[in-house]
Swiss-Prot record:
Positions annotated with a glycan in the UniProt record: 196, 405, 469
Site (Cleavage): 255-256
Cytoplasmic side: 1-62
Family: Belongs to the peptidase S1 family.
Source species of the chain: Rattus norvegicus
Pfam families: CUB, Ldl_recept_a, SEA, Trypsin
Protein name: Transmembrane protease serine 7
């Protein structure tokens, strides 16, 4: 309290009426009247002295004022403390990790020792330069510090400096910190000369290679591991012998596991890491994984110069990776080890390889040799390049290339994810798949260049080469598939996908079946398919009689085979061991049969397998329940680093109106098909594991839909339903709050291919050719549900994938064909077997 305001001797001008106190005292008798002064008679009496008023600054008032002062002081102190805590809590730290190459300073061995005078001096110099860059930038008031973590040699000469940058700012302003913005400040500070046509510029006296500058957001845990005093499970290896294998082994049975292995080889050589086995029970591929980096700090795979490969599943298959420089970082993370986690691996120093050759093809109409990606059978590193020249012995012969689990197609405007091929001045993109293809070049002289991806390490490639007759690519009596394979003409239009791309089953003339012929009775595609095609029904007779097993027969658990198609979970026991009806507790019949364009509001409980997937709280995609823990959706919903992280995702089950789900669970794990192609939407399928299994008490509102049997046969014109909360019309700006349903029909595959041209055997079309009913934005990943007539169960025939617009005439929706992925689903969800 201000002392001047409480002092009774303050000036009268400061007094207020409220400062005056009146004391009323009760006394007996009448109040004395005021006496008039008398004139003195004789000697005057002495006048009485007035009573002294009690002073204001007495002991009692002092105690009161002191108590008030203490109270105000306590309130003020508490308020200031709360404001400080609140201000501190509302600020976030942002971590960025990067590196650049200094070209005008030679590497010293002492730089490997972080306690050495040489390292500390160099680190101080670089930190001062980085400090000056950011303290004079637009982010100066948020900049906190920079820390040099490593100074290493590299195959291009000079020093490779790895560093961290830390910013601190209010949480509300965190959105302004984009990777591009922070990196641009550093790059713009490098002064380059127009006359100097190299990538080297000047940064505060340091000669820095512009092309080497890499900077992106990092994790706080990685920062703490890199600069903390307790490095825990971290090791630095320097390898200088070419013939040695340096072991890397780590294991843990409990607790937290966070290990960093920094591998450095002698200048001019590369590192090959070979992983023999890894044991890891991953919650997701972000927090639980083994990751390989082409640097000494964990810089993500999105960086141009760096590669990263993440493993988050147990494996005992040997895998090896090659660096692009003389260094590599291996990290193993698991925040909570339940059983056993660890790796057994080794690394070695290898020389750089040139990938080029000139080959004279001598054989005629056969494959005579092999070429491969660099460092085969290792994953080949980013930015690699190969050149091959082929020459045939005759001008009538061309070059045939047989790719294993790979295909090349003409390059589009979208670019190439897995590098590009230039073949006789024509550009192609490569993509991985689950079958072989043949690519033919009708020229006796062929120049081929493979330019590897600039960002990714890719699976090894093995290509057989040979010659072929340009005028007759396939032998007489054979059909040439779109995949390049040649199959016997007799296998065309037989109902079996012999070409792997269904090209042998397209544009087939539908004729009345010759029911009485022996060929039809034994091998016809309409035999035992569940549809009666012959008037007497003979095509559906004796379908469960035991016959020798082929690729067209159904196989029971005891290896007995028969002709019946779609026998799995059809409600009829066909196998003696009942294996065809095991694990079939899915999809009760919907009681109602009355992103969806042209659809109507469904009724609650109609589609109990429908799921809404929310990303950061907003509806983003659909999915289908296939078990108590697993969902099935589309891979394109999770494309990219941000969307592939399960942390922001939640699954809303048993929901009719958006926001009113009966059960909500975080997503524990996202498994995207390894061959997914974001350019063509091939292999557009993904599995999601829930963190919490939905309870059995909600089975009336949540139920799994049945997975189709392998190679399920469907017929065009069959009625199915597409459901979702997507847009009702293409022009709508947001989705529907109520679950929509629309009846569609399966479209003939030939019509589908004729419409879009890029349809693979892993896709199917459904819709209404008039355009009245279709899926739309927001329905992606949702189910295409078809009801089986034999038992009334619902089958997940398709997954909403892509299409041209929404509900446009003559452009049906394209769906992922689930029956082609049943073995892949069983690999992760064996309980469905």
């Amino acid at each position: 309290m201000d002392k001047e305001k409480s002092d009774p001797s303050c000036k009268s001008s400061d007094l207020k009426i409220s400062n005056i106190s009146i004391q009323v005292v009760s006394v007996p008798g009448k109040l004395p009247g005021r006496r008039l002064p008398r004139k003195p008679i004789g000697k005057a009496r002495p006048r009485k002295q007035p009573k002294k008023r009690a002073p204001f600054w007495n002991v009692q008032n002092k105690i009161i004022l002191f108590t008030v002062f203490l109270f105000i002081l306590a309130v003020t102190a508490w308020t200031l403390l709360w404001l400080y805590i609140s201000k501190t809590d509302s600020k976030d730290a942002f971590y960025f990790v990067g590196m650049f190459r200094i070209t005008n300073i030679e590497f010293l061995p002492e730089y490997r020792q972080k306690e050495s005078r040489e390292f500390l001096s160099m680190a101080k110099t670089v930190q001062q330069v980085v400090n000056l860059v950011y303290t004079t930038s637009a982010f100066s008031k948020f900049y906190k510090q920079s820390v040099v973590a490593d100074v290493s040699s590299n195959n291009k000469g000079g020093l490779l400096v790895h560093f961290w940058i830390v910013f601190v700012m209010p949480h509300a302003k965190g959105h302004i910190f984009c990777e591009e913005c922070v990196a641009a400040i550093l790059k713009d500070s490098i002064q380059t000369s127009i006359t100097n046509r190299t990538s080297v510029g000047t940064l505060q006296g340091l000669a820095v290679d512009m092309d080497s500058v890499v900077l992106n957001a990092g994790l706080r845990s990685d920062y703490s591991s890199a600069v903390g005093s307790d490095n825990g499970c971290s090791q630095y290896f320097y390898a200088d012998h070419l013939t040695l294998r340096y072991p890397l082994e780590i294991s843990a049975t409990s607790g937290q596991l966070m290990c960093h292995f920094k591998l450095v080889a002698i200048v001019g050589y590369l590192i090959r890491l070979s992983i023999e086995s890894i044991q890891l029970e991953a919650d997701n591929c972000i927090t639980d994984s083994l990751t390989v980096y082409d640097s000494l700090l964990p810089i993500r795979i999105t960086c141009v110069l760096l590669s990263g490969y993440r493993i988050c599943e147990p494996t005992r298959t040997l895998m090896s990776f090659v660096s692009t420089n003389n260094l590599m970082l291996v990290t193993l993370k698991s925040p909570y080890v339940r059983r056993l986690a660890g790796i057994r691996a080794y690394f070695e120093v290898i020389p750089e390889q040139k990938c080029e050759n000139t080959i004279l093809v001598k054989e005629i109409n056969s494959f005579e040799g092999k070429i491969s990606s660099p460092y085969y059978p290792s994953y080949y590193p980013p930015k690699c390049k190969c050149n091959w020249t082929f020459q045939t012995s005759l001008s009538t012969l061309g070059i045939a290339l047989k790719f294993h689990n790979y295909s090349i197609t003409k390059k589009s405007m979208k670019g190439c994810e897995h590098g590009w091929w230039e073949i006789n001045e024509h550009m192609y993109c490569g993509s991985y798949m689950d079958h072989e293809t043949i690519f033919r070049v009708p020229s006796p002289l062929v120049h081929i260049q493979l330019q590897c991806s600039s960002r990714l390490s890719d699976k090894p490639l093995l290509v057989e080469y040979g010659s072929y007759n340009i005028s007759q690519p396939c032998p007489a009596g054979s059909f040439r598939c779109s995949s390049g394979l040649c199959v016997p003409q007799a296998q065309r239009c037989d109902g079996v996908n012999d070409c792997f791309d269904e090209s042998d089953e397209l544009f087939c003339v539908t004729a009345k079946p010759a029911c009485n012929t022996s060929i039809f009775r034994q091998h016809g595609p309409l035999v035992c398919d569940g549809f009666q095609d012959c008037e007497d029904g003979q095509d559906e007779q004796n379908c469960t009689r035991s016959i020798p097993c082929t690729n067209r027969t159904f196989k029971c658990g005891n290896d007995i085979c028969f002709r019946k198609q779609n026998a799995q979970c059809d409600g009829i026991v066909d196998c003696p061991d009942r294996s065809d009806e095991e694990g079939c507790g899915c999809s009760r019949s919907s009681p109602f049969l009355h992103r969806v364009v042209g659809g109507s509001d469904s009724q609650e409980g109609t589609w109990p397998w429908q799921v809404s997937l929310h990303f950061v709280g907003s509806a983003h995609c659909g999915a289908s329940v296939i078990s108590r823990e697993w969902l099935l959706s589309a891979a394109h919903c999770f494309h990219g680093n941000r969307l592939s992280d399960p942390t922001p995702w939640t699954a809303h089950l048993g929901m009719y109106v958006q926001g009113n789900a009966k059960f909500v669970s975080p997503v524990r794990r996202i498994v995207v098909h390894e061959y997914y192609n974001s350019q063509t939407f091939d292999y557009d399928i993904a599995l999601l594991q829930l963190s919490i299994a939905w309870p059995e008490t909600l089975r009336q509102l949540i139920q799994p839909i049945c997975i189709p049997p392998v190679g399920q046969r469907v017929r065009s014109g069959e009625k199915c339903w597409v459901t979702g909360w997507g847009r009702r019309h293409e022009a709508d700006s947001k989705g529907s709050p109520i679950l929509q349903q629309a009846e569609v029909e399966l479209i003939d595959q030939t019509v589908c291919v004729s419409t879009y041209g890029i349809i693979t055997s892993r896709m199917l079309c459904a819709g209404v050719m008039s355009g009245k009913s279709d899926a739309c934005k927001g329905d992606s990943g949702g189910p295409l549900s078809c009801r089986r007539k034999s038992d009334g169960k619902w089958i997940l025939t398709g997954i909403v994938s892509w299409g041209y617009g929404c509900g446009r005439p003559n452009f049906p929706g394209v769906y992922t064909r689930v029956s082609n992925f049943v073995p892949w689903i069983h690999k992760y969800v064996p309980s469905l077997l």
